[in-house]
Amino acid sequence: VETQPQESPDAAPKPEAQSAEPKSIFDLMTGGSISYEADLAAYYLNEMTAAAAEGDVEAGRSAEEKRNAVIDASAAEPDPGKISFDDLYLLSKVICYEAGSDWLTDEFRICVGEVIMNRVASPEYPDSIHDVIYQKGQYSCVNTARFAGLVPTEECVDAALRLLCGERRMVPSVVFQSNDLQGEPFTMYTDRRLGTTYFCLSENQELYPID
């Protein structure tokens, strides 16, 4: 998979990608804190990711509940933060459906999921992962039998977890992913089997101020 930024000679300068460095698995699990409570929260987060990769919703929700109880009862600094198992599982499934093939890169998987996260944060789209994915006319994969029975791979669960923990590769205004251009492209990926996938910017750049 090759990354090929697209430039239009007459277009206004595009925003630069955010410099969100990939976190280590320890940081993802504990928030960087070293304590009994952080270790326990990390244990339950690991249980959540394992459940997602096995398609075990009941176990995942149970692990989330236990992890939240640990976080609520502790004062670990920094706060490892709560993560919804349903968000993790649903995001993982969409990433797996769109980019689950084993020859695709982790970066591509992150970008696929990042479009969803950008939409959640955008004033142009619904404000939850569920509502973004199930918005009419958007992610049609959710209405298929394949999606209903899909169990995400560990790689896709890992990509979803990193996104939920704040990792980013693009800019907040990248809200389109398609095999056809849907606005000004921020970047694109070319694969001999899948063809070209474009990640495009919203037409309403004024809604996405750059810090």
Task: State each model region's role.
Residues 65-211:
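Bacterial extracytoplasmic/cell-wall-associated proteins, especially those involved in peptidoglycan
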Residues 1-81:
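N-terminal, intrinsically disordered, polar/charged segments of Gram-positive cell-envelope systems
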